[in-house]
Amino acid sequence: MQRNGVMECSVCHSKVVAPSPRSVSRAYDKHRSKISSKYRALNFLLVSGDCILVGLQPILVFMSKVDGKFQFSPISVNFLTEVTKVIFAIVMLIIQSRKQKVGEKPLLSLSTFVQAARNNALLAVPALLYAINNYLKFIMQLYFSPATVKMLSNLKVLVIAILLKFIMRRKFSIIQWEALALLLIGISVNQLSSIPDGTKSFGLAVTTIAYIYTLIFVTVPSLASVYNEYALKSQFDTSIYLQNLFLYGYGAIFNFLGILGTVIFQGPESFDILQGHSRATMFLICNNAAQGILSSFFFKYADTILKKYSSTVATIFTGLASAAFLGHTLTVNFLLGISIVFISMHQFFSPLAKVKDDKPAGALEPEDAQNHRSSDSSFVNMTAGAADDASHLTSTDERKPLLPI
């Protein structure tokens, strides 16, 4: 339980100072500085898998449409995806619990589950935002081609960087901000003349509706990703599968509420969550589940910026695959935009672009110094009190022991 910046254990009632966003960021930076070649290989596998899964996602969505429309409810796909991820998290928890050493706190105990649920309650926020975003993914396919959707999603990098700066106190160099500006230029180049003029939908110009959905499509998942990263890293010692169980459980609840809302407005016949599904939608559900699981590893062991930049690499795969299988044309604007995006990515992750810490290694920030001084003063008061008690006991009865026997 957290009150006034202090966390209290529900078991032993001990109190510690709650981690601030900046302290979470510093703790992660310290963990990252000790990263080994094994973790670097893990990051490479995560990026490779993410490129394939993210690249396949819009293509599977496009293949799921019949005559340009979805015969199934997008909310049902999101619900089945969350259920799939919950099952995966439970299976991995069982496997991990069987590999625990003697003396370790059991993962499947009720006390561990309840305590972890309290500590990870913040995961409900990104779960709700993800539920909204997953529905927007289907809406975006009605206005843009798969390759264009992937390019639009790259706009999230800039929004994520801004949110990381204010929420997690992350620092970016001028070169990295310039790299993000290059990313926006590359996306803008790809978007030139990408939407036909004069097309109407819902009585408005398609460009107007598309831009409104794009704004929501970029902001909502960016906020979800940053909050997800903060929630996972703030409880770094908690098993990622246990955290995923809460995250996906919340997501399944929110999507089920969406299904109930659909039943209220469209009638009981819409409650059939398997209605209109095909083999393509089953692949889509598996792809979305695998993509969400990979994202959790990115957020906990890497960072959100790397996750979004890895998604830009998937744009090439998406563009080539959509041109080969769906007949979409790769324009000059698209090729130029991709080139600028890769220049931006190289510049952002260049060693010269890293932020240099001006403070000495042993220096403390004001917040840390204050906590350090308060700890020292508390220790002095504690030792002084102990000395007073000792002198009091000695004057009363020198033969009486200080500690109970």
Curated annotation (Swiss-Prot):
MF GO annotations: pyrimidine nucleotide-sugar transmembrane transporter activity
Keyword Lipid metabolism belongs to the record: no
Stretches of the chain forming a coiled coil according to its record: none
Region named Disordered: 386-405
Pfam short name (any one): Nuc_sug_transp
UniProtKB keywords: Golgi apparatus, Membrane, Sugar transport, Transmembrane, Transmembrane helix, Transport
Main location: Golgi
Cytoplasmic face of the membrane: 1-43, 96-121, 165-171, 225-244, 303-322
Biased composition (Basic and acidic residues): 389-405
Annotated localization: Golgi apparatus membrane
Membrane topology, from the record: Multi-pass membrane protein
Superkingdom of the organism of origin: Eukaryota
Membrane-traversing stretches: 44-64, 75-95, 122-142, 144-164, 172-192, 204-224, 245-265, 282-302, 323-343
InterPro entries: Nuc_sug_transpt (IPR007271)
A GO cellular-component term linked to this record: Golgi membrane
Lumenal side: 65-74, 143, 193-203, 266-281, 344-405
Family to which this protein belongs: Belongs to the nucleotide-sugar transporter family. CMP-Sialate:CMP antiporter (TC 2.A.7.12) subfamily.
Role noted for this protein: Sugar transporter involved in the transport of CMP-sialic acid from the cytoplasm into the Golgi. May transport important nucleotide sugars such as CMP-Kdo (2-keto-3-deoxy-D-manno-octulosonic acid) in physiological conditions.
Protein name as catalogued: CMP-sialic acid transporter 4
Species this chain originates from: Oryza sativa subsp. indica (Rice)
Gene name of this polypeptide: CSTLP4
